[in-house]
Structure formats: structure tokens, C-alpha cells
């Protein structure tokens, strides 16, 4: 059955835009995104150590190869997620993401070789690209234009708090029971619950998009996906600034995911304390987005993005230059603070600059570039670490992060999140 175009008016007069008006579906989507985040969290502490300790991999580049497969596949899944969301509906894409993610924890538990881990992460990339994208897009659909920063902040809070909590729990469980299989059991629970809730309780939000489009005073011009890709990637200065900042943000996150556990372990830190450091960064990032998302609605996006990128850079420099747990903890806190300022502001900035009828596709292009940063960050950090050492890899990517913030300062135009 063909779907009505997104610009068409909805016939359901009971529909309203707003967080209060849609709080039940919004709350369910927050819970589901916590499960999506938890799927990544099971890997943050233990998977790099599985590569080095169980499979005896000595090359940093090879150890981080699982992040490269994850990042490339997730970026491509992001790219098609907006198209699929407009054609099939948001709920169907969300459910598909969970069905693809169900085998991932079992593959990690039973993996007889590193190739299985890489394959599991390709499936995880599809899961994250489809499921996380839909939770973001559906929340933005529900709340309308005035609370985008709040919606994104709450979404990312749930996801990255779950990443942090799960990274801590897997580190703790690994210190007690080994790297496999016990820590990975968490992922089985996340995948089953996420799939069941998505299938049984979530409703599609395309009628909310039609409602917003019908209320807009702007005349929407139909655009092809190629036009949206070029506009989001290069042509629109705000969308370009957001896309490059998103790429660099996840570039340094991919680097930290892959080589921080190896860096800390090289100085004799145990897996439980590594788990603490790996938890502090995403947990700080997740919790503070409750504040930074709404602040971007009030203050505008640009300032938070610029300062946030510079704070991330400072956190990376502190981590690279020091050799003590306490200083690494400070570096992780700075990374979390900076990312909390940047992450919801970037998604809200892209939503601000996009028409409701092609917003999902523009967000999918932004998320393509952003999550391609995982692969670029892990691969470049692995190569630099093999050639010059891990500290050099962290420092060089810290400098690149500072440069990205400077580009946003020069290119992006200031805009309040409350502007239509």
C-alpha cells in the first residue's frame, strides 16, 4: 500500500505537537533508546580487551578494526534510515533495527575468532543506525519546533547514560567472571526488551510530521535525496558546520573506544578501573544533556557547539599528557562535559535548518557523516598508535577536535532554537 506524502494534512484532529501532549510515547522512546545505548555499552570496556587478551592481537590497528566495521556500517544505515522512515514509517524501521541487533550478543559470546567480532559489529552498526536514528527522529516529530533541543537532550541522555552504566557493569562483571560470557548477557536482555517494546507499544509519528508541515507558513519545495545530501554535506553553511563537527566528535569517540582501554592497561590499570573510566565519559555526557539540550533552545546552538568541542580537546590533551588514574578521570569528565554540550545541539541545529518534509533525510545525512567518524577515528588512531605510540594518537586527535570547533565558530550562523 502506498503512503500519503509527508506534506499532506492529517485527518486525525486529536493529534497535537508537544512533549506534554505526547509524554507516554516520548517516555517509551526514551526507555527504548536506553536499551539501544546499552547494546553499545556492552562493548566499550571488554571487546578491545577480548582482542588483545583472548585472541592475542598485538596490532592496535587490528584491535580497533571492529570499530571500523561498526562505524562504516552504522554510517550507511544512517544514510538510508531517513529514506526508509519516510517510505515505510518510523516504527517499521525501528523494529527492523532491533531484529538485526538480536544476534549480536550471541555472536560475541560464541566468537571463535576475531572475524566473528567484526561481523557482530557490522550487525550492531545496522541496529544502531536504524534504531537510534528512529528514536531521535520520532521524538523530534512528537515535540514540534519549539522543544527540539530538549527532545534530543533527553534522547541522548537515556542512550549515553545506558552506555556508561553498561560499560561500568561489564567492567565489574569482567573483573569477577572473565571477559566472556557473563558481561555480554546484559546485551541479550537489552535486545529482547527493546524489540518487544518496539513491536507492541510504539506508534508511528508520520502524522505528527504532516501536522507540523501543514501549520508551517513556509511553502515546502520537493527535494531529491541527492539534493538533500549535497545541501546537508556542503552547500548550507549551518548544515556543513554541523556535519563536520559531528564527524570529528565521533572521530574522537571512536578513538577513545578503541585505544583508551589499551592505553590505560599499558600502565597497569586493572579492568575494573578501566571500566570506571570508560563509564564516566558517556555517563557524564548522558546526564548533562538533560541540561544542555534545553539550554540550546534558549541560548542557541553555536556557542555550545564551539565551546564543547574545545572542552573535548582539553580532555584529550589531559588524558594523553598524564599517567595517573585521577588525571585520566579528569580527562574523562572533560570529554563528557564537552560532548554533552555538542551532541544535542548539533542534532537540533540540523533540525532547525531542515524543512519538516525532508528533515528525516537531512538528519540521516548528518548522522552518516557523524558516525563515519567512528571508523575514521578508530582507523587513524590505530595507525598513529602503531607508528608513534598511543599518547601521540590521542594528542593529534585532540588538536583536530579543537580545529573543528574553530570551523564552527567561523562558519555557522547564530540562531535561536526557538526560531521557526
Where are the regions that the model predicts?
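Symmetry-related core transmembrane helices of the 12-TM Major Facilitator Superfamily/SLC fold
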Residues: 182-199, 394-410
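Residue-level signature of mid-helix packing/kink "hotspots" within the transmembrane helices
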Residues: 71-79, 164, 282-290, 374-375
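Juxtamembrane intracellular "pre-TM" segments in multi-pass secondary transporters
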Residues: 3-23, 207-242
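Cytoplasmic helix-loop-helix junction between adjacent transmembrane helices
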Residues: 120-160, 348-349
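Helix-loop boundary and gating motifs at the non-cytosolic
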Residues: 20-71, 238-245, 249-267
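C-terminal ends and interior cores of transmembrane alpha-helices
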Residues: 99-112, 311-323
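Helix-to-loop junctions at the C-terminal end of transmembrane segments
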Residues: 77-89, 174, 288-300, 385
